[in-house]
């Protein structure tokens, strides 16, 4: 009969971050840690859990703004604060090959790239920026190459997100709007604007649900949920007024549902 192995009881119980360090270290002989009765806060995660560091990735000149990973190719993309085109780039790292950095960074923006997002199919990489534009890169056998883009908003573009089927994407801006785009079979202009959803305040974040609903987080703390009717028109489904006391910087839908998690500062 198969042998059942009991979990080890002498494992490391906690960790801490040294005063001048960036990574947590195991604490030997730590006292017994009580089981959590509610989700741990950041301080508890830092002091009572051990997440082994695998690698540090370098290359940017300033603090990071956005990080994303493609689960198809295991590529990691990162961006940083930038006031010049030289720093407004996407750097790629191959997690399957010892986090080897790509030879060339992806260029095209002139100011900070505020969000980078891989399409679910792994073919495209979307970026949005403080320069009020979005750009898209397409994966080829030799790597990602610049493909399409547009200066689409009147103010900073804070977020960009892909629909589950990888044919549509949304961009959220400080100009109080979310624009929905779709890829089309047109060699001259392989994308078109589907619609513009106007909000009552600056839109800071946007995401798609698995059923195609669209959620947006506003600067005033509101969360709005839109759904698409059978005739293709978008309708405001739910408004969570002043759901937070500050800007809703991220919204996330459950993988197999419509409900959201929202995060402010």
Which role fits each region the language model picked out?
Residues 62-69, 111-118, 154-162, 200-209, ...:
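Canonical WD40 repeat/beta-propeller blade segments in eukaryotic WD-repeat proteins
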Residues 1-62, 200, 204, 219-222, ...:
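Terminal intrinsically disordered, low-complexity extensions flanking WD-repeat/beta-propeller proteins
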Residues 1-2, 39-43, 79, 87-95, ...:
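WD40-repeat beta-propellers
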Residues 79-86, 128-131, 171-175, 202, ...:
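Conserved strand-to-loop turn within each blade of WD40 beta-propeller repeats
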Residues 98-100, 142-143, 186, 231:
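Short coil/turn linkers that define WD40 beta-propeller blade boundaries
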Residues 47, 55-59, 102-108, 146-152, ...:
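Short C-terminal beta-strands that terminate individual repeats in beta-propeller domains
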């Amino acid at each position: 009969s198969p042998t059942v192995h009991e979990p080890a009881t002498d494992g490391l119980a906690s960790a801490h971050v040294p005063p001048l360090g960036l990574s947590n270290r195991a604490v030997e002989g730590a006292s017994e840690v009580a089981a959590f009765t509610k989700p741990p806060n950041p301080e508890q995660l830092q002091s009572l859990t051990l997440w082994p560091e695998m690698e540090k990735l370098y290359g940017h000149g300033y603090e990071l703004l956005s990080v994303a990973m493609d689960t198809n190719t295991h590529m990691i993309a990162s961006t940083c604060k930038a006031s010049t085109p030289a720093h407004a780039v996407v750097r790629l790292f191959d997690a399957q090959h010892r986090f080897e950095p790509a030879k060339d960074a992806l260029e095209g923006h002139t100011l900070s790239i505020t969000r980078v997002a891989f399409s679910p199919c792994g073919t495209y990489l979307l970026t949005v920026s403080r320069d009020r534009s979005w750009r898209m890169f397409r994966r080829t056998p030799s790597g990602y190459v610049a493909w399409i883009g547009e200066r689409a908003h009147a103010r900073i573009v804070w977020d960009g997100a892909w629909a589950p089927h990888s044919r549509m994407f949304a961009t959220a801006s400080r100009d109080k709007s979310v624009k929905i785009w779709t890829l089309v079979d047109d060699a001259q202009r392989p994308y078109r604007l589907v619609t513009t959803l106007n909000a009552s305040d600056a839109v800071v974040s946007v995401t798609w649900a698995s059923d195609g609903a669209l959620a947006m987080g506003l600067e005033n703390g509101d969360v709005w949920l839109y759904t698409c009717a059978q005739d293709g028109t978008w309708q405001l489904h739910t408004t969570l007024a002043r759901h937070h006391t500050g800007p809703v910087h991220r919204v996330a839908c459950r993988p197999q549902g419509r409900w959201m998690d929202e995060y402010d500062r």
